[in-house]
Amino acid sequence: MGLEWSSPGERQPLLFPGGPRSPRVFGRRWLVLLLFSVLAFLQGLVWNSWGPIQISARTAYKFSGLDIALLVLWGPIGFLPCFLFMWLMDNRGLRITVLLTALLMVLGAGLRCVPVEDLAIRRILIHGGQLLNGFAGPTVMNAAPFLSTTWFAPDERATATAIASMLNYLGGACAFLVGPLVVPAPNSTSGLLLYSGSTDAIKDRIEAVMYAEFGIIFVVFAAILAYFPARPPVPPSVAAASRRLSYRTSIFRLLSNLRFLLIVLAYAIPLGFYSGWIGVLDLILTPVHVTQVDAGWVGFWSIVGGCVVGIAVGRFADSIRGVLKPILLLLFSGATLSATWFTLTFLSNVTHLPLTTATLYTSCILIGVFLNGTVPIFFELFVETVYPIPEGIACGVVTFLSNIFMGVLLVFLTMYQMELSWLNWCLTGSCFLSLFFIACFRESYDRLYLDVFVSV
């Protein structure tokens, strides 16, 4: 009876006839992880280039508030061809997909550097460059679990996923640091060196940053072109050697899996809102008289803290397997409390909570620590829940939905720019909702079962 409801692909045995060769790991896996992580770092750095220096960018290039919002919005818009990249990864492998991604980033970074005197044309080129960089987002966000399964042993997978996925966030964090320190604010000396805040001086510094980013991205592209294997000679685990469902079957299975959809919403809503929120943190903190540099430091440490916690939690998950849901419950409890604290701080006249630099720093950094720390754990849980659906397809659906929520938030931002406290309430409410979804979720570890018991 069950055969009537399954596709031919689903009726194939997971393991190839005769069994897979004995699993083995190769030292080159760390080089592959390094190249991919650096690429992900640079994509995040370029995506978040403009938010932290939005005041200087308005002066140098006559950007409007709508322009600044659009420069951030190109990130989620770049996820529209997400399903194409998922298909490419599933059918052509990691090398072709990563090469195409790196090429898009080179073209995007180069487009921003075209020396045109007309500011209107220059703004169009910058927008185009940001869009091309956005098209690289699906790969750098989705491929981490695929890479870790392809190259790493079961007791290293969560750690590799954490490193590969967190470096993209770290790149976005470094944009909060690099931009405000290198690019001076108008009529100030807040840059890396004492420097006149004139329009020409600001423009020169912004262009220096863009040229440097282009050069580094080109070097990474050349390194990937020279050496980035699609897979190791021998799979590192039983799961890596097993058959996977086809692209079409995987999509249907994902959309009909209620447990998967529940945990997807638990990830997509708060992480999507947080990505949009942190991208315009400078605008949110402006009404409470936080400078561009201070806002940059807040954003930087909030994401860096999340990256450190994410990698540490990933290592812990590798050491003690089967505890992904409790980890998520703990992290989201902290995120919910921190977001509530940050939001109520802006209502100090009502709540009487102190509105100081220390409270803003602490609450904002804790939000980033707890939310960003959940990303690699979510990715591992997605793959475990829907195995044997390919990792790239499962995570592609997830990040696509996350960017839809991020895009919706930024679209509303383009219409309601005067008063931004509603962004804080959206973030807090999404954390509460996600905590409820995680509590209702029933976890399973199908891929882990295959590796532990079948290999034995």
UniProtKB/Swiss-Prot annotation:
Which residues are noted as glycosylation sites? N187, N349
Q: Per the Swiss-Prot or TrEMBL record, what residue ranges does the short sequence motif Di-leucine motif cover? A: 14-15
Cited InterPro entries: FLVCR1-2_SLC49-like, MFS, MFS_trans_sf, SLC49A4-like
Membrane-crossing segments per the record: 30-50, 68-88, 96-116, 124-144, 163-183, 208-228, 260-280, 293-313, 327-347, 363-383, 393-413, 421-441
Give the UniProt keywords, A-Z: Glycoprotein, Lysosome, Membrane, Transmembrane, Transmembrane helix, Transport
Lumenal membrane side: 51-67, 117-123, 184-207, 281-292, 348-362, 414-420
**How does the record say this protein sits in the membrane?**
Multi-pass membrane protein
Entry's Gene Ontology molecular function annotations: transmembrane transporter activity
Q: Does the keyword Amino-acid biosynthesis apply?
A: no
Instruction: Name a single GO cellular component.
Output: lysosomal membrane
Q: Which reaction does it catalyse?
A: pyridoxine(out) + n H(+)(out) = pyridoxine(in) + n H(+)(in)
Please list the residue ranges that the record places on the Cytoplasmic side of the membrane: 1-29, 89-95, 145-162, 229-259, 314-326, 384-392, 442-456
- What does the UniProt entry say about where the protein is found? Lysosome membrane
Among its keywords, does the record have Protein transport? no
GO biological process, alphabetically ordered: pyridoxine transport
**Protein family according to the UniProt entry:** Belongs to the major facilitator superfamily.
Described by its record, this protein's role is as follows: Mediates H(+)-dependent pyridoxine transport.
Q: What is this protein called?
A: Solute carrier family 49 member 4 homolog
Question: Which species is listed as the source?
Answer: Xenopus laevis (African clawed frog)
